[in-house]
Amino acid sequence: MTLEITGSELIKSKLIDAPERSGVYRMFDVNKQVLYVGKAKNLKKRLTNYIKSNLDNKTLRMIANTCFLEYSITNSEVEALLLEAQLIKKFQPKFNILLKDCKSFPFIKLRLDHDFPQLLKYRGKTLSDGKFFGPFASSAEVNTTLTELQKIFKLRSCTDNYFNSRTRPCLQYEIKRCYAPCVGKINKEDYRDLVTQVKDFLQGRTKELQENLSRKMEELSSQMRFEEAAEIRDRIKALSYVQLKAGVSDVVKDADIIAIVEKNGHYCVEVFLYRAGQACGNIPYFPTSTENSTKEEVLEYFLLQFYQKQHVPAAIIINHEINDKENVIEAIKKINNILQINITVPNKGGKAKLVQNAETNALFSLEQYLKKFAKNQEIMFEIKELFGLSEIPERIEIYDNSHIQGKFAVGVMVVAGKVGFDKKEYRVFNVHAPSLVCHSRESGDPKRLMDSCFRGNGIKNCGGDIKGDDYEMLRQVLTRRLTRLRQEPHKLPSLMIIDGGKGHLGVVKEVMDKFEMNIPFVCMSKGVDRNAGFEQFHVIGKEVFTLDKNLPVMKYLQILRDEAHNFAIKNHRLGRSRAIKISRLDDIEGVGETRKKALLHYFGSYKAVCDATIYELAKVNGINKLLAEMIFNVLHRKN
């Protein structure tokens, strides 16, 4: 494809028809990948800024790579802000300030659609039926709180299927973490009283709760019911301990405390969550592509991206003003379909102290991040020199596979970046029989392979049998990966590392030539006696070489290889385990797909099916007593 004009000349040509209205513009590279999304109060004036002479290096690089430019007119600045945020979220442009690893925060959910409500962890932005408490900064925070609640209040945490199938109390009852309502160890009224206590605690009404419990304890004591009174006493003590450990604020009830700090062009945004006056944890974020950006710009982009995924509290308290606060508030309200939010910057008082504490934590987090970044950059520079790369690598992909004599075969890809492993970019590839691969290669349809086999983390099916052919496995994996890279050229790796030797090197070159790609790659094989520290490196056009096992770069390469190896084994075991489970049910005459689904739906999991008695199995729709006995015998026979 020949482009007539690019860069600043392209922008000049677009200025002729650019309107003096609010809107959003998009810059694309030669592959039509979005480089940058920007908003403007006046599109013509904003685009004019890109042809001035005093531009920073980041902007100059962006303009130099711009081959296409499009813009959309909006009815208002708020609409432009909304559209910009949506497009950034969708395309993740290289030159935009991006908030990475922003998973939705978990909640504690109290189900209210059952006679005996269940406490569980919930993650997701859209809150379904039930009572929700949180959010919490991490799963660890939720799990810790749930454990404490189970110790204190002993509400059930099991699924409905498990609850309905019980004929005797489970282990949770034995270790005093559940009152076993499934088998009638507690009546509905007493259980409902416990549910009310849990609500009071999670909503911050701990003082009233403790007063009520104290009155109840005295009442029980006066009735000579000392054992029950002692249980209430222990509950009061446990509540006091949990409250003290969690940290309670009298200053804010429902708020996010957000502080931004900067050092050497890098930013950290620390978020502290407070709900019902209780601290629910904190988490640091490190926005990318912040070169030559101001605190105001970074914080504005952070808020817009953060609150596309997270629950919006009553108050958002920040440590730095943003330029377009009113429009940002309106955009967040529209994104979340809410009527009111409050963004403030306190100068004194208790809120200012909370912000100062968040800022102190942000500085510490940023210093730790920069130390890790600097150390990683040193290693990346050594890798560049070692393998003769044109630039310091920003993305390294490492490949490995795992199988047992060709069965349950999976290939994996792990990714390392500027500050370590990027786990959301990890991929698992189901490896299928050679006949499928050969057919697809002959038909020249690598997309079919990609569509059917390329997936994210997790096992779709249990893998194929490829007769232990490591080369064929690698050929499949790379075919799928390079097919995907044709669609995602912005994810082209700086280097590929393959766990393998000279033969694997030839396979990689064959696939690269087929796709007419020139990605640098190296094969890393076990050395003498397969001992760590004696690895051999195979590069096209070079003799096989080794490295001193004490060199930092050697240790780093071993870490990369081991991460891929462990990820491959983990997913191979998942596939094998799933296949074995499925095959044991498949061994039972009279149990087809419908009955398998009925069993799993009724009991909730394969393990629960295995734990069920003959009487419990016979309760499932479509399973009579004779078939229940057959299922029980097959699942419990010794191999």
UniProtKB/Swiss-Prot annotation:
Residues 207-242 form the UVR domain. Residues 20-97 form the GIY-YIG domain. The keyword Nucleotide-binding does not apply. SUPFAM superfamilies: C-terminal UvrC-binding domain of UvrB (SSF46600), GIY-YIG endonuclease (SSF82771), RuvA domain 2-like (SSF47781). InterPro entries: GIY-YIG_endonuc, GIY-YIG_endonuc_sf, GIY-YIG_UvrC_Cho, RuvA_2-like, UVR_dom, UVR_dom_sf, UvrABC_protein_C, UvrC. Keywords: Cytoplasm, DNA damage, DNA excision, DNA repair, Excision nuclease, SOS response. SMART domains: GIYc. It is found in: Cytoplasm. The keyword DNA damage applies. Belongs to the UvrC family. Interacts with UvrB in an incision complex. This is UvrABC system protein C. It comes from Rickettsia africae (strain ESF-5). The lineage of its organism: Bacteria, Pseudomonadati, Pseudomonadota, Alphaproteobacteria, Rickettsiales. The gene is uvrC.
